[in-house]
């Protein structure tokens, strides 16, 4: 059958091109040498890029040397080499640049690669499996860019990439909406339990 996926949109044909992640990404290290005051972000397992103030409420950067931090722009990627195997990899969607810890690995998509498609690829179970296989270390696995770049995969035309990305992004949005509805229903149920079952005390 060739190098094609099991499930495919009918308008596309032809084999996907074999490659490595190093063929479709470009590693970069843009340091904040000018000490530009930018918002500080972290890469989380489930929420992607978030302001550090949301993750560490008491974080105070006054007097901290920020020239070693890395600058990230819209559509750039970053991951935590010690936690990529549990989902700590994301694409930055902010309209203005931010800065992140120097510990993160940063990269961009090459020409001909859709960033949204790439993000779905990098979070796919098969690719995540290879994060562990290609990582180094004992109890904690570290995956730095040279080993990340060796992971083998395949990619279709840019048109097919975008079609796939649009579908998967739509499904993600529906799941997010449904989860919010579930959370509201759970809150409602708790309120009903208090009103219907719990007796007044005192």
Q: How would you label these PLM feature ranges?
A:
Residues 8-32:
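Non-catalytic DNA-recognition/assembly elements of restriction-modification systems
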Residues 28-63:
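DNA target-recognition patches
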Residues 2-6, 82, 98-103, 136-159:
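A short glycine-rich beta-alpha junction/loop motif
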Residues 162-174:
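Extracellular/lumenal glycan-associated surfaces
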Residues 64-127:
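A short beta-sheet element
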Residues 1-14, 177-202:
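Short amphipathic coiled-coil heptad-repeat segments
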Residues 10-15, 105-115, 133, 146-165:
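Proline-centric
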């Amino acid at each position: 059958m060739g190098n094609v996926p099991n499930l495919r949109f009918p308008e596309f044909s032809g084999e996907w091109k074999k490659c490595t992640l190093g063929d479709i990404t470009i590693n970069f290290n843009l340091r904040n040498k000018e000490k530009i005051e930018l918002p500080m972000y972290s890469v989380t397992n489930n929420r992607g890029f978030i302001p550090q103030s949301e993750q560490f409420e008491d974080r105070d950067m006054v007097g901290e040397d920020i020239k070693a931090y890395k600058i990230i722009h819209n559509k750039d990627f970053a991951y935590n080499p010690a936690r990529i195997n549990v989902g700590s990899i994301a694409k930055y969607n902010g309209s203005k640049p931010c800065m992140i810890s120097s510990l993160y690995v940063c990269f961009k998509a090459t020409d001909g690669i859709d960033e949204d498609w790439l993000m779905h690829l990098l979070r796919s179970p098969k690719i995540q499996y290879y994060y562990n296989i290609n990582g180094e270390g004992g109890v904690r696995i570290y995956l730095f860019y040279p080993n990340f770049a060796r992971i083998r995969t395949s990619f279709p035309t840019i048109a097919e990439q975008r079609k796939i990305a649009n579908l998967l992004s739509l499904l993600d949005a529906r799941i997010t909406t449904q989860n919010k509805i579930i959370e509201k229903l759970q809150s409602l149920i708790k309120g009903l339990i208090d009103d219907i079952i719990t007796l007044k005390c005192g």
